[in-house]
């Protein structure tokens, strides 16, 4: 697409997209006059362009992205989608990425499909008939993979705290991608009747299904089924998803709707962030003023878990206590220009390798105390002094 656009000197094409895997040549500075990337969630392949101003992003809750198309805020001319080959009845599958695709496609003038035999066939809202496709191009290449990395000692400890203290038998779980969620999942081998209702899931879920730990039998909605909206993982995950009726891939405005999330029994939402301040404000999408990622589904699930119908929801923010350079991720105040994704009123638990900070019902003095206790020991004294300067009182339980 990029090569064709440059060769034909096509100008001012706006590309709206979710997180993308692989190279993004359209986002290179030399192609800025041809294409402008507008991301709903910034990936590493467009991050530099967004920060340089040659690309852009839309801050938005993941569950509200379909509204952008359904209500005409963005009117696509063409939807480029990725599907499996059609079955004997003419139905293709969106496979690993249902999220907001149907909303965008239904509002587009034309639908162009890349048909790939390596795309797993999934069910639910993933099914689309070939009669809806205006153009189809066969291109059979393996999907991008994210192989599981061994968690660090600190990530393993975070996973242990969460698995042993915050995840109960019968819990319904949401987790993102990364070493911390993988660490949590790897330590749930003795749990029973876990359920999955998550915008995404990865390889760790496959292992728990095979061990009999994830059954979804205590769920009250979609009982006996994993519910997701998109997936990124290894080939093992894609093979597990293919033709598997145990999995329902549904639209993200349903999966991530906080009202739907709140109905899940023992909803346990595990999300990460960039930094937290001593009052519990969570920054997840920027480093200071520089945009880094996006809202994603964090607040959708944190809110849903906090407002759970059964009163047993657990909204969890998990992070290592320091950066790779040793800078504390628990700060007296967020960096200048940093955005708040999850506000301090809805945060319940903050977990680092040093423990669990329980924040619900705590005043500012108590919150500062809880968070400083899970900060890295090298930074606690400085944080206490900064807390006193900010709150005019020493942190105390």
Question: Positions of the model-derived regions?
Answer:
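Conserved alpha/beta enzyme-core scaffold
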Residues: 1-397
